[in-house]
Protein backbone atom coordinates (compact mmCIF):
# COMPACT_ATOMS: atom_id res chain seq x y z
CA UNK A 1 0.00 0.00 0.00
CA UNK A 2 1.44 3.39 -0.98
CA UNK A 3 1.43 5.84 1.84
CA UNK A 4 -0.17 9.16 0.94
CA UNK A 5 1.72 12.34 1.76
CA UNK A 6 -0.51 15.18 2.85
CA UNK A 7 0.20 18.71 4.01
CA UNK A 8 -2.62 20.35 5.97
CA UNK A 9 -1.36 23.85 6.55
CA UNK A 10 -1.20 27.24 4.93
CA UNK A 11 -4.46 26.57 3.13
CA UNK A 12 -2.82 24.14 0.73
CA UNK A 13 -4.79 21.36 -0.93
CA UNK A 14 -2.50 18.41 -1.59
CA UNK A 15 -2.37 15.76 -4.28
CA UNK A 16 -2.97 12.13 -3.30
CA UNK A 17 -1.05 9.18 -4.65
CA UNK A 18 -2.66 6.17 -6.23
CA UNK A 19 -3.43 2.86 -4.55
CA UNK A 20 -6.52 0.99 -3.54
CA UNK A 21 -8.42 1.86 -0.38
CA UNK A 22 -8.33 -1.03 2.05
CA UNK A 23 -11.53 -2.93 2.65
CA UNK A 24 -12.35 -3.53 6.29
CA UNK A 25 -12.98 -6.82 8.00
CA UNK A 26 -16.71 -6.01 8.08
CA UNK A 27 -16.91 -5.50 4.30
CA UNK A 28 -19.32 -8.34 3.70
CA UNK A 29 -21.56 -7.28 6.55
CA UNK A 30 -24.89 -6.33 5.02
CA UNK A 31 -26.80 -3.32 6.26
CA UNK A 32 -30.17 -4.29 7.76
CA UNK A 33 -33.07 -3.08 5.61
CA UNK A 34 -35.59 -0.91 7.39
CA UNK A 35 -37.88 -0.12 4.43
CA UNK A 36 -37.81 -0.90 0.72
CA UNK A 37 -39.85 0.03 -2.33
CA UNK A 38 -40.34 -1.09 -5.89
CA UNK A 39 -41.99 2.29 -6.49
CA UNK A 40 -43.53 5.02 -4.37
CA UNK A 41 -47.20 5.63 -3.76
CA UNK A 42 -49.07 7.96 -1.42
CA UNK A 43 -51.88 7.93 1.08
CA UNK A 44 -54.37 9.99 -0.91
CA UNK A 45 -57.14 9.43 1.62
CA UNK A 46 -59.38 7.48 -0.77
CA UNK A 47 -59.20 5.36 -3.91
CA UNK A 48 -61.23 8.01 -5.75
CA UNK A 49 -58.71 10.71 -4.90
CA UNK A 50 -55.85 8.48 -6.02
CA UNK A 51 -57.53 7.70 -9.36
CA UNK A 52 -58.16 11.41 -9.94
CA UNK A 53 -54.46 12.09 -9.30
CA UNK A 54 -53.45 9.41 -11.81
CA UNK A 55 -55.87 10.60 -14.51
CA UNK A 56 -54.84 14.24 -14.10
CA UNK A 57 -51.11 13.43 -14.20
CA UNK A 58 -50.62 14.64 -10.64
CA UNK A 59 -49.32 11.18 -9.74
CA UNK A 60 -47.18 8.90 -11.92
CA UNK A 61 -45.34 6.19 -9.99
CA UNK A 62 -42.60 6.05 -12.64
CA UNK A 63 -41.38 9.57 -11.82
CA UNK A 64 -41.01 9.40 -8.03
CA UNK A 65 -37.38 9.32 -6.89
CA UNK A 66 -36.21 9.84 -3.29
CA UNK A 67 -33.43 12.34 -2.61
CA UNK A 68 -33.13 12.47 1.19
CA UNK A 69 -34.25 10.93 4.48
CA UNK A 70 -34.16 11.75 8.18
CA UNK A 71 -35.80 10.50 11.35
CA UNK A 72 -37.36 12.17 14.39
CA UNK A 73 -38.83 9.85 17.02
CA UNK A 74 -41.11 7.49 15.08
CA UNK A 75 -41.32 9.73 11.98
CA UNK A 76 -39.12 8.93 9.01
CA UNK A 77 -39.02 11.73 6.46
CA UNK A 78 -38.56 11.08 2.75
CA UNK A 79 -38.10 13.84 0.18
CA UNK A 80 -38.91 13.39 -3.49
CA UNK A 81 -37.45 15.48 -6.29
CA UNK A 82 -40.36 17.24 -8.00
CA UNK A 83 -40.75 15.65 -11.38
CA UNK A 84 -44.02 15.67 -13.29
CA UNK A 85 -46.18 13.12 -11.51
CA UNK A 86 -44.84 13.75 -7.99
CA UNK A 87 -47.81 14.82 -5.85
CA UNK A 88 -45.78 15.74 -2.75
CA UNK A 89 -42.09 16.48 -2.26
CA UNK A 90 -41.84 16.44 1.57
CA UNK A 91 -43.30 13.34 3.20
CA UNK A 92 -43.26 10.92 6.10
CA UNK A 93 -43.61 7.16 5.86
CA UNK A 94 -47.11 6.12 6.87
CA UNK A 95 -48.16 2.85 8.48
CA UNK A 96 -50.07 1.87 5.36
CA UNK A 97 -48.52 -0.35 2.71
CA UNK A 98 -49.25 -0.38 -1.02
CA UNK A 99 -48.13 -2.56 -3.92
CA UNK A 100 -44.80 -0.76 -4.16
CA UNK A 101 -44.06 -0.52 -0.44
CA UNK A 102 -45.00 1.72 2.50
CA UNK A 103 -47.21 4.64 1.47
CA UNK A 104 -45.99 8.20 1.87
CA UNK A 105 -47.96 10.93 3.60
CA UNK A 106 -47.32 14.61 2.85
CA UNK A 107 -45.76 16.62 5.67
CA UNK A 108 -47.11 18.50 7.45
CA UNK A 109 -50.21 18.13 5.24
CA UNK A 110 -51.38 18.28 1.63
CA UNK A 111 -51.49 22.08 1.61
CA UNK A 112 -47.69 22.24 1.45
CA UNK A 113 -47.65 19.91 -1.56
CA UNK A 114 -49.32 22.52 -3.77
CA UNK A 115 -46.97 25.02 -5.34
CA UNK A 116 -48.93 26.77 -8.10
CA UNK A 117 -48.64 30.10 -6.28
CA UNK A 118 -45.19 29.24 -4.87
CA UNK A 119 -46.54 29.18 -1.31
CA UNK A 120 -45.96 25.43 -0.94
CA UNK A 121 -42.89 23.26 -1.39
CA UNK A 122 -41.81 22.74 -5.00
CA UNK A 123 -38.89 20.33 -4.67
CA UNK A 124 -37.45 19.43 -1.27
CA UNK A 125 -34.00 18.44 -2.45
CA UNK A 126 -32.55 18.03 1.06
CA UNK A 127 -33.56 18.24 4.71
CA UNK A 128 -31.91 18.26 8.13
CA UNK A 129 -33.12 17.88 11.71
CA UNK A 130 -31.18 19.86 14.29
CA UNK A 131 -30.74 19.33 18.02
CA UNK A 132 -33.49 21.89 18.69
CA UNK A 133 -36.19 19.63 17.20
CA UNK A 134 -36.45 21.75 14.08
CA UNK A 135 -36.78 20.41 10.56
CA UNK A 136 -34.91 22.43 7.93
CA UNK A 137 -36.00 21.92 4.32
CA UNK A 138 -34.12 23.10 1.25
CA UNK A 139 -36.56 23.77 -1.60
CA UNK A 140 -34.66 24.08 -4.88
CA UNK A 141 -37.71 25.56 -6.65
CA UNK A 142 -37.04 23.30 -9.64
CA UNK A 143 -39.39 21.01 -11.54
CA UNK A 144 -37.83 18.01 -13.30
CA UNK A 145 -34.61 19.04 -11.53
CA UNK A 146 -33.87 21.65 -14.21
CA UNK A 147 -36.81 24.00 -14.72
CA UNK A 148 -37.14 26.94 -12.29
CA UNK A 149 -40.74 27.10 -11.09
CA UNK A 150 -40.36 29.29 -7.99
CA UNK A 151 -37.54 30.97 -6.11
CA UNK A 152 -35.51 28.55 -4.00
CA UNK A 153 -36.19 28.83 -0.29
CA UNK A 154 -35.33 27.54 3.14
CA UNK A 155 -38.15 26.40 5.42
CA UNK A 156 -38.05 25.59 9.14
CA UNK A 157 -40.67 23.50 10.97
CA UNK A 158 -41.18 22.91 14.68
CA UNK A 159 -41.28 19.13 14.86
CA UNK A 160 -43.14 19.10 18.16
CA UNK A 161 -46.09 20.97 16.63
CA UNK A 162 -45.52 20.47 12.85
CA UNK A 163 -45.92 24.23 12.48
CA UNK A 164 -43.96 26.28 9.98
CA UNK A 165 -41.60 28.55 11.91
CA UNK A 166 -39.89 30.37 9.10
CA UNK A 167 -39.64 30.57 5.33
CA UNK A 168 -36.87 32.53 3.66
CA UNK A 169 -36.37 33.01 -0.07
CA UNK A 170 -32.82 32.60 -1.31
CA UNK A 171 -31.97 35.63 -3.49
CA UNK A 172 -31.38 34.92 -7.16
CA UNK A 173 -27.88 36.41 -7.14
CA UNK A 174 -26.99 34.02 -4.32
CA UNK A 175 -28.71 30.92 -5.69
CA UNK A 176 -27.02 30.94 -9.10
CA UNK A 177 -23.55 31.46 -10.48
CA UNK A 178 -23.39 35.05 -11.71
CA UNK A 179 -20.98 34.15 -14.51
CA UNK A 180 -22.58 31.01 -15.90
CA UNK A 181 -26.17 31.61 -14.81
CA UNK A 182 -26.32 28.00 -13.59
CA UNK A 183 -27.65 26.88 -10.25
CA UNK A 184 -29.11 23.82 -8.55
CA UNK A 185 -29.19 23.72 -4.76
CA UNK A 186 -28.52 20.13 -3.81
CA UNK A 187 -27.04 19.71 -0.34
CA UNK A 188 -27.73 21.05 3.16
CA UNK A 189 -26.00 21.14 6.54
CA UNK A 190 -27.32 22.91 9.65
CA UNK A 191 -25.23 24.10 12.60
CA UNK A 192 -27.35 24.97 15.64
CA UNK A 193 -25.11 25.93 18.55
CA UNK A 194 -27.69 27.24 21.01
CA UNK A 195 -31.37 26.33 20.96
CA UNK A 196 -32.29 29.32 23.12
CA UNK A 197 -31.27 31.89 20.53
CA UNK A 198 -31.62 32.18 16.76
CA UNK A 199 -28.28 33.94 16.50
CA UNK A 200 -26.31 30.71 16.82
CA UNK A 201 -27.75 28.82 13.83
CA UNK A 202 -25.98 28.73 10.48
CA UNK A 203 -26.98 26.81 7.39
CA UNK A 204 -24.69 25.66 4.59
CA UNK A 205 -26.10 25.02 1.12
CA UNK A 206 -24.27 23.53 -1.86
CA UNK A 207 -24.95 24.66 -5.42
CA UNK A 208 -23.76 21.72 -7.49
CA UNK A 209 -24.54 23.22 -10.92
CA UNK A 210 -23.23 26.70 -10.11
CA UNK A 211 -20.28 25.32 -8.10
CA UNK A 212 -20.77 27.49 -5.05
CA UNK A 213 -21.26 27.30 -1.29
CA UNK A 214 -23.96 29.42 0.36
CA UNK A 215 -23.76 30.38 4.04
CA UNK A 216 -26.96 31.52 5.75
CA UNK A 217 -27.10 33.26 9.15
CA UNK A 218 -30.45 32.73 10.84
CA UNK A 219 -30.01 35.74 13.12
CA UNK A 220 -30.21 38.36 10.37
CA UNK A 221 -31.37 36.26 7.38
CA UNK A 222 -28.17 37.09 5.53
CA UNK A 223 -26.80 34.95 2.71
CA UNK A 224 -23.21 34.81 1.48
CA UNK A 225 -22.11 32.98 -1.65
CA UNK A 226 -18.57 31.60 -1.75
CA UNK A 227 -16.49 30.29 -4.62
CA UNK A 228 -13.44 28.03 -4.60
CA UNK A 229 -11.75 25.75 -7.08
CA UNK A 230 -12.40 22.95 -4.58
CA UNK A 231 -16.10 23.29 -5.48
CA UNK A 232 -15.51 22.63 -9.18
CA UNK A 233 -16.09 19.33 -10.92
CA UNK A 234 -13.15 17.45 -12.44
CA UNK A 235 -13.67 16.71 -16.17
CA UNK A 236 -11.77 13.43 -15.75
CA UNK A 237 -14.47 12.02 -13.46
CA UNK A 238 -17.76 13.04 -15.08
CA UNK A 239 -18.54 9.45 -16.09
CA UNK A 240 -20.42 7.74 -13.26
CA UNK A 241 -20.70 3.95 -13.47
CA UNK A 242 -22.96 2.01 -11.09
CA UNK A 243 -23.48 -1.74 -11.44
CA UNK A 244 -22.14 -1.62 -15.00
CA UNK A 245 -24.46 1.21 -16.11
CA UNK A 246 -23.08 4.68 -16.82
CA UNK A 247 -24.22 8.28 -17.07
CA UNK A 248 -22.53 11.68 -17.19
CA UNK A 249 -22.63 14.25 -14.38
CA UNK A 250 -20.85 17.59 -14.78
CA UNK A 251 -21.68 18.65 -11.23
CA UNK A 252 -19.66 20.37 -8.53
CA UNK A 253 -19.85 20.57 -4.74
CA UNK A 254 -22.38 18.28 -3.13
CA UNK A 255 -22.65 15.59 -0.45
CA UNK A 256 -21.82 17.85 2.49
CA UNK A 257 -21.48 16.74 6.11
CA UNK A 258 -20.77 18.77 9.23
CA UNK A 259 -18.63 17.34 12.00
CA UNK A 260 -20.02 17.95 15.51
CA UNK A 261 -16.52 17.37 16.89
CA UNK A 262 -14.25 19.56 14.76
CA UNK A 263 -16.81 21.87 13.08
CA UNK A 264 -15.35 20.85 9.73
CA UNK A 265 -17.73 20.92 6.78
CA UNK A 266 -16.75 18.04 4.50
CA UNK A 267 -17.67 17.97 0.82
CA UNK A 268 -16.69 16.69 -2.62
CA UNK A 269 -17.68 17.73 -6.12
CA UNK A 270 -19.96 15.10 -7.66
CA UNK A 271 -17.48 14.56 -10.50
CA UNK A 272 -14.36 14.12 -8.39
CA UNK A 273 -12.40 11.59 -6.35
CA UNK A 274 -11.19 14.26 -3.93
CA UNK A 275 -12.26 15.02 -0.37
CA UNK A 276 -12.26 18.58 0.96
CA UNK A 277 -13.33 20.46 4.06
CA UNK A 278 -13.61 23.97 5.44
CA UNK A 279 -13.65 24.79 9.14
CA UNK A 280 -16.87 26.65 9.92
CA UNK A 281 -15.34 28.67 12.77
CA UNK A 282 -14.37 31.02 9.95
CA UNK A 283 -18.05 31.84 9.32
CA UNK A 284 -19.07 32.70 12.90
CA UNK A 285 -19.03 36.42 12.21
CA UNK A 286 -20.87 37.92 9.26
CA UNK A 287 -17.99 40.22 8.30
CA UNK A 288 -15.69 37.49 6.97
CA UNK A 289 -14.20 38.04 3.52
CA UNK A 290 -14.18 35.47 0.75
CA UNK A 291 -10.42 35.72 0.23
CA UNK A 292 -9.79 34.98 3.91
CA UNK A 293 -11.51 31.58 3.86
CA UNK A 294 -9.15 28.60 3.81
CA UNK A 295 -10.12 25.27 2.34
CA UNK A 296 -8.27 22.04 3.03
CA UNK A 297 -8.33 18.53 1.65
CA UNK A 298 -6.72 15.89 -0.50
CA UNK A 299 -7.10 15.56 -4.24
CA UNK A 300 -7.82 12.14 -5.73
CA UNK A 301 -7.70 10.36 -2.38
CA UNK A 302 -10.60 8.03 -3.28
CA UNK A 303 -10.80 5.25 -5.86
CA UNK A 304 -14.17 6.43 -7.17
CA UNK A 305 -16.55 9.36 -6.87
CA UNK A 306 -18.22 9.86 -3.50
CA UNK A 307 -21.85 10.70 -2.79
CA UNK A 308 -23.66 11.43 0.48
CA UNK A 309 -21.65 12.03 3.64
CA UNK A 310 -22.30 12.13 7.38
CA UNK A 311 -20.15 12.44 10.52
CA UNK A 312 -20.82 10.67 13.80
CA UNK A 313 -20.46 12.39 17.17
CA UNK A 314 -17.29 10.39 17.74
CA UNK A 315 -15.76 11.85 14.58
CA UNK A 316 -16.27 9.09 11.99
CA UNK A 317 -16.90 10.43 8.49
CA UNK A 318 -18.96 8.05 6.35
CA UNK A 319 -19.32 8.50 2.59
CA UNK A 320 -20.87 6.66 -0.31
CA UNK A 321 -18.44 5.22 -2.87
CA UNK A 322 -20.33 5.50 -6.14
CA UNK A 323 -18.50 3.14 -8.48
CA UNK A 324 -18.02 0.51 -5.78
CA UNK A 325 -21.62 0.53 -4.51
CA UNK A 326 -20.02 0.73 -1.09
CA UNK A 327 -19.80 2.64 2.19
CA UNK A 328 -16.45 4.14 3.14
CA UNK A 329 -15.23 5.77 6.34
CA UNK A 330 -12.41 7.77 7.90
CA UNK A 331 -11.87 8.77 11.53
CA UNK A 332 -11.08 12.39 12.35
CA UNK A 333 -8.70 11.19 15.09
CA UNK A 334 -6.40 9.98 12.31
CA UNK A 335 -4.62 11.90 9.58
CA UNK A 336 -6.49 12.23 6.31
CA UNK A 337 -4.43 9.73 4.37
CA UNK A 338 -5.42 6.97 2.02
CA UNK A 339 -4.23 4.17 4.32
CA UNK A 340 -6.60 5.46 7.04
CA UNK A 341 -9.69 5.10 4.82
CA UNK A 342 -11.71 1.93 4.94
CA UNK A 343 -14.60 0.35 3.05
CA UNK A 344 -16.95 -1.11 5.67
CA UNK A 345 -19.90 -2.27 3.57
CA UNK A 346 -20.44 -3.19 -0.07
CA UNK A 347 -23.38 -4.55 -2.01
CA UNK A 348 -24.00 -4.45 -5.73
CA UNK A 349 -27.66 -5.05 -4.96
CA UNK A 350 -28.56 -2.77 -2.04
CA UNK A 351 -25.98 0.05 -2.14
CA UNK A 352 -26.39 1.30 -5.70
CA UNK A 353 -25.89 5.05 -5.14
CA UNK A 354 -26.02 6.04 -1.50
CA UNK A 355 -28.10 9.21 -1.85
CA UNK A 356 -28.48 10.16 1.80
CA UNK A 357 -27.11 9.28 5.23
CA UNK A 358 -27.98 10.50 8.71
CA UNK A 359 -26.56 9.73 12.15
CA UNK A 360 -29.15 9.17 14.87
CA UNK A 361 -28.99 8.09 18.50
CA UNK A 362 -30.24 4.81 19.97
CA UNK A 363 -31.83 2.31 17.62
CA UNK A 364 -35.56 2.19 18.39
CA UNK A 365 -35.51 -1.54 19.16
CA UNK A 366 -32.46 -1.33 21.48
CA UNK A 367 -33.39 -1.68 25.19
CA UNK A 368 -33.04 1.57 27.09
CA UNK A 369 -30.25 0.21 29.29
CA UNK A 370 -28.15 -0.62 26.21
CA UNK A 371 -28.56 2.71 24.46
CA UNK A 372 -25.68 4.30 26.31
CA UNK A 373 -23.37 1.59 25.00
CA UNK A 374 -24.63 1.51 21.40
CA UNK A 375 -25.60 5.14 21.08
CA UNK A 376 -25.33 5.95 17.42
CA UNK A 377 -26.73 4.34 14.30
CA UNK A 378 -26.57 5.33 10.68
CA UNK A 379 -29.54 5.65 8.32
CA UNK A 380 -28.73 5.01 4.66
CA UNK A 381 -30.86 5.67 1.56
CA UNK A 382 -29.96 4.08 -1.78
CA UNK A 383 -31.83 5.07 -4.92
CA UNK A 384 -30.21 3.59 -8.08
CA UNK A 385 -29.43 7.03 -9.51
CA UNK A 386 -28.21 5.53 -12.79
CA UNK A 387 -31.67 4.11 -13.43
CA UNK A 388 -33.27 7.49 -12.80
CA UNK A 389 -30.91 9.33 -15.16
CA UNK A 390 -31.23 6.71 -17.90
CA UNK A 391 -34.96 6.19 -17.32
CA UNK A 392 -34.72 2.40 -17.27
CA UNK A 393 -36.10 1.32 -13.90
CA UNK A 394 -37.64 -2.12 -13.63
CA UNK A 395 -40.49 -1.45 -11.22
CA UNK A 396 -40.97 -5.15 -10.59
CA UNK A 397 -37.65 -5.07 -8.72
CA UNK A 398 -36.83 -3.41 -5.41
CA UNK A 399 -35.29 -0.06 -6.38
CA UNK A 400 -35.16 2.06 -3.23
CA UNK A 401 -34.04 1.10 0.26
CA UNK A 402 -33.61 2.65 3.68
CA UNK A 403 -31.08 0.73 5.77
CA UNK A 404 -29.57 1.18 9.20
CA UNK A 405 -26.61 -0.07 11.20
CA UNK A 406 -25.01 0.50 14.56
CA UNK A 407 -22.00 2.77 14.08
CA UNK A 408 -19.78 0.98 16.59
CA UNK A 409 -20.50 -2.42 15.07
CA UNK A 410 -19.99 -1.11 11.53
CA UNK A 411 -16.46 0.17 12.20
CA UNK A 412 -15.41 -2.54 14.67
CA UNK A 413 -11.79 -3.67 14.16
CA UNK A 414 -11.13 -1.12 11.41
CA UNK A 415 -9.06 2.06 11.32
CA UNK A 416 -12.31 4.01 11.56
CA UNK A 417 -12.42 3.15 15.26
CA UNK A 418 -10.89 5.73 17.60
CA UNK A 419 -7.21 4.97 18.22
CA UNK A 420 -6.77 3.59 21.75
CA UNK A 421 -3.76 5.74 22.39
CA UNK A 422 -5.03 8.96 20.88
CA UNK A 423 -8.35 10.61 21.72
CA UNK A 424 -7.37 13.95 20.21
CA UNK A 425 -9.08 14.81 16.92
CA UNK A 426 -7.04 15.44 13.80
CA UNK A 427 -5.61 18.95 14.14
CA UNK A 428 -6.52 21.57 11.59
CA UNK A 429 -4.58 24.71 10.77
CA UNK A 430 -7.04 27.61 10.58
CA UNK A 431 -6.08 31.02 9.27
CA UNK A 432 -8.57 33.77 10.10
Swiss-Prot record:
Activity versus pH: the note is: Optimum pH for protein stability is 4.0. Protein becomes unstable at pH above 9.0.
Query: Do you know which Gene3D superfamilies this protein is assigned to?
Result: TolB, C-terminal domain
* PTM entry text: N-glycosylated on Asn-28, Asn-144 and Asn-177. Glycosylation is required to prevent apisin multimers from aggregating.
Residues with attached carbohydrate? 28, 144, 177
Tagged with keyword Repeat: no
Q: Which residues form the signal peptide?
A: 1-19
Query: What are the Histidine amide sites (modified residues) in this protein?
Result: 431
- Name its cellular compartments: Secreted; Cytoplasm; Cell projection, Rhabdomere; Cytoplasm, Cytoskeleton
Expression by tissue: Found in and secreted from the hypopharyngeal glands of the worker honey bee (at protein level); expression peaks at 12 days post eclosion. Expressed in the brains of worker bees (at protein level); found in antennal lobe, optical lobe and a subpopulation of Kenyon cells in the mushroom body. Found in the ommatidia of worker bees (at protein level). Expressed in the spermatheca of adult queen bees (at protein level); expression levels are higher in mated queens than in virgin queens. Expressed in queen bee ovaries and male drone testes.
Q: Name one GO cellular component term.
A: rhabdomere
**UniProt GO BP:** caste determination, influence by environmental factors; defense response to fungus; defense response to Gram-negative bacterium; defense response to Gram-positive bacterium; killing of cells of another organism; multicellular organism adhesion to substrate
Give residue numbers for the modification (Leucine amide): 432
Which domain of life does the protein's organism represent? Eukaryota
Upregulation details from the record are: Moderately down-regulated by the ecdysteroid 20-hydroxyecdysone (ecdysterone or 20E).
Disulfide bonds, which pairs? Answer: 118-150, 132-195, 329-416
Q: Is Secreted there in the keyword field?
A: yes
List ligand-binding residues for 24-methylenecholesterol: 364
What are the entry keywords?
Answer: Amidation, Antibiotic, Antimicrobial, Cell projection, Cytoplasm, Cytoskeleton, Developmental protein, Disulfide bond, Fungicide, Glycoprotein, Secreted, Signal
Q: Which GO terms describe its molecular function?
A: sterol binding
Q: Which Pfam families match?
A: MRJP
Tell me which family the UniProt entry assigns to this protein.
Belongs to the major royal jelly protein family.
What is noted besides the main data? Exhibits a growth factor-like action on primary-cultured rat hepatocytes by stimulating DNA synthesis and protecting cells from apoptosis induced by serum deprivation. Also activates mitogen-activated protein kinase, as well as protein kinase B, a key regulator of cell survival.
Give the multimer and partner information.
Is present in royal jelly in different forms: monomer (55 kDa), oligomeric subunit (ca. 287-420 kDa), and water-insoluble aggregates in sediment after interaction with fatty acids. Component of the apisin heterooligomer complex consisting of 4 copies of MRJP1 and 4 copies of apisimin, associated with 8 molecules of 24-methylenecholesterol; apisimin forms a bridge connecting two MRJP1 dimers. At low pH multiple apisin octamers stack to form filaments that increase the viscosity of royal jelly; these filaments may be stabilized by bound fatty acid chains.
Protein name, please? Major royal jelly protein 1
Lineage of producing organism: Eukaryota, Metazoa, Ecdysozoa, Arthropoda, Hexapoda
